[in-house]
């Protein structure tokens, strides 16, 4: 797909041609080579912009459209590990990537280490993904009330077991972890979650700097 009109794109450059932010109009444009190329495991993320995963939004057509703007990584909408393991057709479709999509980045959600491990083993073993992002940020009350989503880091042992299951079954495919500050201001879990994720081998973490309540 051709870059968006007004941009000149190469493997490591995306140069605005006369376009400036209205907010940061006094900030100079970066020069080639000024910033090191960010890496997530073996993946180079350039330009250093990531399309954040969002259920019902970051599907294949939306990711295709966003590639015109030149982000370096496009994460799929949330896919449930249990649905993949059980072979649900709708879930399987969510885990599909177009031939031109690279790297193929999927966000996986689950509350059981076993199903997470099996789902990652399936995705990696079949060569279907280049990156797995673990979702611990869902703020929906119907999810957090049952101990899922953003509430999982409240249970450090479960959180560690889930992340470890993904990392141990991922082979050379990098695993990242997305989480929030916590469930509310009285239950902030992000520091411990980040330390645990690093300790068990996650390649990177992503912090949604709000609580689930917010």
Language-model segments: which ranges?
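Acidic, Ala/Val/Gly-enriched low-complexity intrinsically disordered segments
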Residues: 11, 15, 22-27
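Glycine-rich, positively charged N-terminal anion/phosphate-binding segment
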Residues: 26-39, 54-130
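N-terminal small/glycine-rich loop or linker at the start of catalytic domains
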Residues: 38-50, 82-103, 138-148, 170-178
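Structural preference for beta-strand elements that scaffold enzyme active sites
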Residues: 48-50, 73-75, 103-107, 131-133, ...
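Alpha/beta enzyme core
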Residues: 120-148, 152, 156-214
């Amino acid at each position: 797909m051709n870059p968006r009109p007004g941009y000149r794109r190469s493997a490591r450059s995306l140069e605005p041609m006369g376009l400036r932010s209205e907010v940061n109009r006094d900030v100079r444009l970066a020069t080639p080579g000024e910033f090191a190329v960010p890496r997530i495991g073996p993946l180079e993320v350039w330009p250093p912009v990531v399309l954040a995963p969002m259920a019902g939004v970051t599907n294949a057509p939306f990711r295709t459209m966003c590639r015109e703007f030149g982000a370096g990584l496009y994460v799929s909408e949330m896919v449930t590990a249990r649905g993949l393991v059980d072979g649900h057709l709708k879930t399987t479709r969510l885990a599909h990537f177009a031939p031109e999509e690279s790297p193929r980045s999927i966000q996986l959600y689950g509350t059981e280490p076993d199903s997470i491990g099996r789902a990652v083993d399936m995705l990696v073993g079949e060569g279907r993904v280049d990156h797995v992002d673990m979702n611990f940020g869902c703020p929906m009350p119907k999810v957090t009330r049952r101990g899922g989503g953003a509430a999982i880091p409240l249970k450090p042992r479960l959180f560690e077991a889930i992340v470890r299951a993904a990392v141990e079954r991922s082979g050379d495919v990098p695993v990242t972890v997305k989480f929030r500050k916590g469930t509310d201001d009285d239950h902030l879990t992000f520091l411990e979650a980040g330390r645990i994720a690093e300790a068990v081998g996650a390649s990177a973490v992503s912090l949604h700097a709000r609580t689930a309540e917010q």
